[in-house]
């Protein structure tokens, strides 16, 4: 301090312009107001943590998409067959996941509004019905994948047997047509057996007029004639009691009808009867909901799916003819009561056997 004062005094006396030393300069700066000597802050140097995270996520997503696109192009160029299977599998997972979310939403609405299955709209009922079948098949594949290293074998089996182990979400467009033809061929094998059982049962019908009408109907179908709706409805009394009511069907009849409905026939007779009745009741409920909605409100794919469920191989039939056939089915179904649903079950064979191109 004494030295600095001496320097300043000498400078004042001599009128010199000598600058103070670095130590003195720093002391003078420290003596001034504090904030004045600091450098101004720059907002660009201090980004918020949220902005940094968003920029990082955006960068990672962009890079991932670019790498994924390059990977897809590589597979498409060098492994086209594998790439087709890969894209079909990935799309199938997305569609199955979307179906699961939709089914969950429908079930939640049913619980909140205290609705029963038959009180839903047609599309909601059909979605739940189909999703239950799909998820049952997926659960079976999941169960056989549980043992260690079994998942590798399951992937191989899914590649070799896609029709048996995979649902339609994982089929290619060509496979969908081919597999539906295969399934229809399986159920067509039972058509002649179902008609034979009907002819045999006609001998036990007590009413003479009904017995003759049932025999004539079997003869028409066996000769290649498509029956009219009024001819089928005239026999509704035969299917409410012995010998063709649900409770009176024999085991061989139920096995043949199960094959016609694409259900397993290898179950005890009580389970076969219960399962056939349950599926027929669901179809009857769907028919009532569809009649309320109107066939004209359905898309072409929805019409084909509805016809296929009811026994018609609609994959090779024009849309207008599918709608006409579905109209005949609904006319019969909506005229039946619950005790007469055995006729609706047999309708799977009676109405589909000789309809247009379905007979091959």
UniProtKB/Swiss-Prot annotation:
The keyword Zinc does not apply. The keyword Transmembrane applies. Residues 1-137 are cytoplasmic. The modification Phosphoserine is found at residue 192. It is found in: Mitochondrion outer membrane; Nucleus; Mitochondrion inner membrane. Induction: Up-regulated in white and brown adipose tissues upon cold exposure and beta-adrenergic signaling. GO terms for cellular component: mitochondrial inner membrane; mitochondrial outer membrane; mitochondrion; nucleolus; nucleoplasm; nucleus. It is a single-pass membrane protein. It comes from the Eukaryota. Its main location: mitochondrion. Signal peptide: none annotated. Residues 178-360 form the Letm1 RBD domain. One of its GO terms (molecular function) is molecular adaptor activity. Residues 1-110 are annotated as: Required and sufficient for mitochondrial import. Plays an essential role for mitochondrial structure and function, as well as thermogenesis of brown adipocytes. In brown adipose tissue also localizes in the nucleus where it interacts with the chromatin remodeler SMARCA4 to regulate thermogenic genes expression, such as UCP1. May regulate phagocytosis and inflammatory responses to lipopolysaccharide in macrophages. Involved in tumorigenesis and may function as a negative regulator of the p53/TP53. Interacts with BRI3BP. Interacts (via C-terminal) with SMARCA4; the interaction regulates transcriptional expression of thermogenic genes in brown adipose tissue. This is LETM1 domain-containing protein 1. The lineage of its organism: Eukaryota, Metazoa, Chordata, Craniata, Vertebrata.
């Amino acid at each position: 301090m004494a030295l600095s004062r001496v320097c300043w005094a000498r400078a004042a006396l001599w009128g010199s312009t000598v600058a103070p030393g670095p130590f003195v300069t720093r002391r003078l700066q420290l003596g001034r107001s504090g904030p004045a000597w600091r450098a101004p802050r720059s907002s660009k140097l201090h980004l918020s943590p949220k902005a940094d995270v968003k920029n990082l996520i955006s960068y990672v997503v962009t890079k991932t998409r670019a790498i994924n696109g390059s990977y897809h192009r590589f597979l498409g160029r060098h492994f086209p067959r594998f790439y087709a299977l890969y894209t079909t599998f990935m799309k199938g997972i997305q569609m199955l996941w979307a179906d699961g979310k939709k089914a969950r939403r429908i079930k939640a609405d049913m619980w909140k509004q205290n609705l029963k299955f038959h009180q839903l709209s047609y599309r909601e009922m059909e979605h739940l019905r189909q999703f239950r079948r799909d998820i049952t098949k997926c659960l079976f594949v999941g169960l056989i994948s549980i043992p260690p290293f079994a998942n590798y074998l399951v992937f191989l089996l899914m590649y070799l047997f896609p029709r048996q182990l995979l649902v339609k979400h994982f089929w290619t467009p060509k496979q969908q047509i081919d597999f539906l033809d295969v399934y229809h061929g399986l159920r067509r094998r039972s058509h002649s057996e179902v008609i034979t059982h009907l002819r045999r049962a006609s001998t036990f019908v007590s009413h003479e007029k009904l017995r003759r009408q049932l025999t004539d109907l079997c003869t028409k179908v066996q000769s290649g004639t498509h029956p009219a709706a009024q001819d089928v409805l005239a026999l509704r009394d035969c299917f409410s009691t012995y010998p063709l009511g649900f409770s009176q069907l024999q085991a061989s009849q139920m096995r043949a009808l199960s094959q016609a409905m694409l259900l397993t026939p290898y179950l005890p007779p009580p389970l076969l009867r219960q399962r056939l009745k349950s599926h027929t009741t669901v179809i009857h409920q769907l028919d009532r909901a569809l009649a309320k909605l109107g066939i004209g409100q359905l898309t072409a794919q929805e019409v084909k799916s509805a016809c296929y469920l009811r026994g018609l191989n609609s994959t090779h039939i024009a849309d207008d003819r599918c709608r006409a056939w579905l109209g005949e089915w609904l006319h019969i179904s909506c005229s039946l009561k619950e005790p007469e649903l055995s006729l609706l079950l047999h309708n799977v064979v009676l109405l589909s056997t000789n309809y247009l191109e379905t007979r091959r």
